[in-house]
Amino acid sequence: MAGRLRVALVAGEASGDILGSGLMQALRARHPEIEFIGVGGPRMEAEGLSSYFPMERLSVMGLVEVLGRLPELLRRRKRLIRTLIDARPDVMIGIDAPDFTLGVEHRLRQAGLRTVHYVSPSVWAWRQKRVLKIREACDLMLALFPFEARFYEEHGVPVRFVGHPLANTIPLQADRVAARERLGLPLDGQVVALMPGSRGGEVGKLGELFLDTAQRLLGERPGLRFVLPCASAARREQIERMLQGREPLPLTLLDGASHEALAACDAVLIASGTATLEALLYKRPMVVAYRVAGLTYRILKRLVKSPYISLPNLLAGRLLVPELIQDAATPRALATTLSPLLDDGSQQVEFFDAIHRALRQDASAQAAEAVLQLVERR
């Protein structure tokens, strides 16, 4: 492809900044004469993006917070659309953050520009009618998972399965001994990772439950040890408060280091979320648990169309890992379900290995190829 390319990218959160920077590297490797404009974080800026405003202005979580910032978000989106239409990039790529980026993509596509969306929203699980908006908004969807690609194909949306970047980052075989040495854990004996989530609300719902489960497991298996990676200082303080007044537990709290914890452990008790994909890629047998407010659960039960909540089961297309939700998630049930996996989790591990290899596609390279092919079809 000859000539200079102008590529617009819009990311709204840290995970999108990581994906965006990898995509920018892969695009430049294939087409050195390239200019990047749009909105991104420090990683994308380090790759040469001229960001129109700080990405953090789009990073809003929670309904109340979104409502409080809605006038600013709408104003920024309107200005961004106008700026990008004037700039006439060869292609615009929205990275995740669908509530913001899909609106931008839709307006740019109406103005005759090529648009791509990188990372599918969970339309296959709930609010499936959003696929109609996606079909109008983008020329191409870049999907991280094969079941997402199948969903879009069924709904007439051009899609390319590119794999997941973590599948290339995480080795096919993690070194458990080296991880334990780095964490100062004994090399013999079994270790269970407790991962109750990264947000305060999740830890509030699951932290005590996971600690109670650990106490039960310890009663059955006196030599067991536990590690719990804390996503932030606030989460560590939250867990430390929960530990006060409890019977002593052979538990190591870690600052971050969730990947080290997964590499070091023999099995995982884990909140439903993206961390379950990381546990799968580390080939660690797991039990998934989740609790939300009662009203939220009743609403989600009506809206969610998927039979599973965890990525390992969605990727396997069957109930591969146990999911204990709401009232079913009790210390006794979790301990009873997890304990056999410490003796033999090979069935899960075999599937995890096959899934890891399927996702190991070099996502950034695949995404870059798909974007450039779209541009060539002008």
Swiss-Prot record:
GO BP term (any one): lipid A biosynthetic process
Cellular component, GO, one term: membrane
Gene3D superfamilies on file: Glycogen Phosphorylase B
Catalyzed chemical reaction(s): a lipid X + a UDP-2-N,3-O-bis[(3R)-3-hydroxyacyl]-alpha-D-glucosamine = a lipid A disaccharide + UDP + H(+)
Cited InterPro entries: Glyco_trans_19 (IPR003835)
Top-level enzyme category: transferase
Metabolic or biological pathway, per its Swiss-Prot or TrEMBL entry: Bacterial outer membrane biogenesis; LPS lipid A biosynthesis
Function statement: Condensation of UDP-2,3-diacylglucosamine and 2,3-diacylglucosamine-1-phosphate to form lipid A disaccharide, a precursor of lipid A, a phosphorylated glycolipid that anchors the lipopolysaccharide to the outer membrane of the cell.
Source species, domain of life: Bacteria
Family in the record: Belongs to the LpxB family.
GO molecular function: lipid-A-disaccharide synthase activity; phospholipid binding
Protein name: Lipid-A-disaccharide synthase
Keywords linked to the UniProt accession: Glycosyltransferase, Lipid A biosynthesis, Lipid biosynthesis, Lipid metabolism, Transferase
A Pfam family hit: LpxB
Keyword Transcription regulation: no
NCBIfam families with a match to the protein in the record: lpxB
Coiled-coil blocks: none
EC number assigned by the record: 2.4.1.182
